[in-house]
């Protein structure tokens, strides 16, 4: 789920990470605050600075949503396997949740390139293969993008044996983005219409192998984001009580739908709506959801790990059995001691 939505994740290693990505992903994960170690935030429009300490800066997410919020019933049909492009997967989920037809992200195609010492073939939008030429002293790849309107740009880059990519705005260096082994969506910053965004990275000139590149650059449609945020926030779950294993809140649903929860779906969650037990669903095979009807409802969640009751009964039974065996053993020992003392007394009598 996280990997297909553009977050760094390794299914083989069972490793899942958070990296600053898009405001919509932060909505889905319930992120309210961000801490930036370098103090640099490429897109300040989506966050608000709240504190600074040396080089560390904390930000408040302007598009934060509560732990639960009302989404359309079509969200239950969402599948992460419909597309390999993380932006289009987000577009699909956003449309199902909100019913808004306009896409949240729009693809920005390559304006031109400035490669050096590398032969590159394009295999479709975002997909390339390259072959470094041994004669080049410092081979590198360079892609330029130019949005047609003021926007926030985001990129998804997957390339082997590259640790970071340099980002330029109108030929001016802005920052370097570290690339993890697990690729993910990252922000490029805010751009005016006609401004040039450049991604440039060096290629290992010792390599004689073909390399594969996946590079998507998309523009965020901020009006669509704002419309969707206002809609989802209006159906937010108002939390009234919570603990490590319990959560209670009130949801005002203006239509039949699903209460999406930024909580991983597990069998251990038990949910009641207005005091009645209800079945949960898994959204995208990962997140918890609860079908609700229109109206005002009290939703209560309680977590008890699957197998806890059976495990407790087995453990209790084992303790009782051990206690019973211990008591029997002690009685037998006392009986043996009594018999031994009696025999010694008879032996000692005149």
Residue ranges and their predicted role:
Residues 87-116:
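Predominantly extracellular/luminal regions of secreted and cell-surface proteins
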Residues 1-11, 18-21, 50-62, 70-71, ...:
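Extracytoplasmic/secretory soluble proteins
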Residues 1-25, 65, 70-75, 81-90, ...:
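Extracytoplasmic/lumenal acceptor-recognition loop(s) of multi-pass membrane glycoenzymes
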Residues 112-342:
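Active-site-proximal, structured, solvent-exposed surfaces of multi-pass membrane proteins
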Residues 24, 29-85:
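Aromatic/acidic, Gly/Pro-rich catalytic loop(s) in extracytoplasmic/lumenal soluble domains
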Residues 340-350:
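Solvent-exposed, low-complexity, intrinsically disordered
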